[in-house]
């Protein structure tokens, strides 16, 4: 639950309340409350602003995940699939984009401007296999380049994964991470 909450919003809210309390206490001549409001409120507001400037919002799911697929995920998802899902569906700080380092290591991010942008996730059941689908807007990297890197993507994201790449519409690429684990 905590990763779904923006620390920037918490800092700005709590800091704002304390700062306003400090100003009101100053006007009413309550010295101790005034100092507490200023000494804690203003730094929290500044910290909240700094976090807001470095904030990367969570990536949404393109469809809600059904209970059946959640059960399949709990049984068959690889640690890598779980880590990717958890990382991109929470607030991040100090990163340019979700999966930016991974895309760079895979050779799919020549520059920040040309980097594909992760736009949504989808969890699916393909013939009893758990699939995590990453949808990227990729105006500068062609489908052919993605397909050339398909084997490298599979090796990069670890064992027990098969990777397929598709282009459902122009300049949009989907990367399907298919778990190869068998039901117990």
Swiss-Prot record:
**Record's keyword terms, sorted:** Membrane, Thylakoid, Transmembrane, Transmembrane helix
> Any transmembrane segments, and where?
5-25, 31-51
Tell me any Pfam family this protein matches.
DUF2854
Q: Which domain of life is it from?
A: Bacteria
The keyword Nucleotide-binding belongs to this UniProt entry's keyword annotation: no
Q: Which InterPro entries match?
A: DUF2854
Subcellular locations according to the entry: Cellular thylakoid membrane
Q: How does it sit in the membrane?
A: Multi-pass membrane protein
Give me the Gene Ontology terms describing cellular component.
plasma membrane-derived thylakoid membrane
Protein name according to UniProt: Thylakoid membrane protein slr0575
Q: Which organism is it from?
A: Synechocystis sp. (strain ATCC 27184 / PCC 6803 / Kazusa)
């Amino acid at each position: 639950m905590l990763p779904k909450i923006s620390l920037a919003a918490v800092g700005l809210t709590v800091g704002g309340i304390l700062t306003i309390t400090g100003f009101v206490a100053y006007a009413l001549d309550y010295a101790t409350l005034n100092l507490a409001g200023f000494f804690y409120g203003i730094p929290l507001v500044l910290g909240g602003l700094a976090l807001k400037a470095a904030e990367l919002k969570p990536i949404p799911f393109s469809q809600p995940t059904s209970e059946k697929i959640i059960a399949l995920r709990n049984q068959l998802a690889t640690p890598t699939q779980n880590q990717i899902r958890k990382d991109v569906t929470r607030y991040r700080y100090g990163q340019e984009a979700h999966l930016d380092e991974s895309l760079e290591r895979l050779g799919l991010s020549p520059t920040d401007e040309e980097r594909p942008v992760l736009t949504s996730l989808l969890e699916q059941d393909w013939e009893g296999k758990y699939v995590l689908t990453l949808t990227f807007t990729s105006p500068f990297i062609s489908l052919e380049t993605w397909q050339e890197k398909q084997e490298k993507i599979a090796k990069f994201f670890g064992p027990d994964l098969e990777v397929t790449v598709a282009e459902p519409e122009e300049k949009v690429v989907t990367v399907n991470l298919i778990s190869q684990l068998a039901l117990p």
